[in-house]
């Protein structure tokens, strides 16, 4: 395929047009009075959303050069979403502002490399000032405030703060669709995995069809148990202790399963068998997690261990285990807290180094199960369109809340970015680096201007007053009042503001220093074949 190439100002101008088209579409959603954008879907009803990254991903422009500019801004939104989970619209607005001011100066003859150095220095100073202004998020009320601001719903804020209180900041909080109209929270404490009992005759409550084991021993193995003789010595030892047993194995079949069921029915001892969770290497890792959580050992050939040689010392223990037909929950495992903490640290490091989104998701699930539990927010709505929009808002709120707990909070509504202007303005730079610094100074005002504009106010008047206000005092665009943003619960996580600014500056600098753009030349549309005269028959 032949290529089309544009150079210097032509190349940059085409990309900037794409940046503006995407940013102008996304920025109308910013702030409490932000509007929605309707996205056409190939199948089903249109999606109505105010989620910046969702909108950015949908935009595809016909002109290849403009499309590259749009895609670079979309990358800013995606990267910010990956790191902080929110702030995608702010990142888009900042990118457009830096590119717009930068292009003016490059066109006027400024050195793009000098501008880039100035931008990088200014952003580093702004980030440092943001961190210095941060307030730690320590209590349930503060968490609820962050979630409520992001989701625009106090009820959602309460659900998320309650979920984080129950399962901890590393716990898994999943968002599912409810069968009803109401949104509700469901919390499963302890480690849960998706494997149920192998026989319904193992239940202890025939009405609820669940097996409850109090203070059980837990046999953990990646082997298949077919011959009861393999575990007979172990069963005899457990029988003397008069405690129930949970067997987690690759499978239990052959004569072993009916023998266990028969002894359960006769009341000889209480036993429940389940299949090991996961597959392949992930199964081995999950079994090791369970062993560390319960203080047991995985009986596996990898360690040279055989079932017939297993003793009670190799078994895990827990305060309670509940098993139904689909899942198993282990509560209060008896594992060594230091060993659990070390395992958590290992999984965290794997999350940071993995490049696979699927692997990262599975590692986060394992981390949460070791850390304390799983919370499920079941989203209810009247229509499918409303349900999709609500799920996106709750996902944003959850991500923003995690970010707030991690790095603290600052005043919201774009106020925090405006508050760091003095720290950037005092930087002593020379040459075109000064121009780069001034570009960042102007960009830091842009989120406040856009939020005010979307709410029907004049942005320049708001920013002028904000520059002279005390730290933390800002403009509440929802009411049109000047308030203490922190006291009013109008807050942003530092991680969100920081990531938005850093990612915006990074991509904007790349666009400013671009000197040539190579794109695929559009394929000419082939003319329709001429009609065969013989096919025209009596038409002549």
Curated annotation (Swiss-Prot):
E.C. number: 5.6.1.7
UniProt keyword Isomerase, yes or no: yes
Principal EC category: isomerase
Chain sites annotated for binding ATP: 29-32, 86-90, 413, 476-478, 492
GO annotation (BP), single: protein refolding
Principal location: cytoplasm
MF annotations from Gene Ontology: ATP binding; ATP-dependent protein folding chaperone; isomerase activity; unfolded protein binding
UniProt subcellular location: Cytoplasm
Keywords: ATP-binding, Chaperone, Cytoplasm, Isomerase, Nucleotide-binding
Annotated CDD domains: GroEL
Top-level taxonomic group: Bacteria
PROSITE patterns tied to this protein: CHAPERONINS_CPN60
Pfam families: Cpn60_TCP1
Reactions performed catalytically: ATP + H2O + a folded polypeptide = ADP + phosphate + an unfolded polypeptide
Gene Ontology cellular-component annotations: cytoplasm
Primary role: Together with its co-chaperonin GroES, plays an essential role in assisting protein folding. The GroEL-GroES system forms a nano-cage that allows encapsulation of the non-native substrate proteins and provides a physical environment optimized to promote and accelerate protein folding.
HAMAP family: CH60 (MF_00600)
Protein family (similarity comment): Belongs to the chaperonin (HSP60) family.
Record's subunit section: Forms a cylinder of 14 subunits composed of two heptameric rings stacked back-to-back. Interacts with the co-chaperonin GroES.
Name of the molecule in the record: Chaperonin GroEL
Native organism: Streptococcus pneumoniae (strain P1031)
GN (gene name): groEL
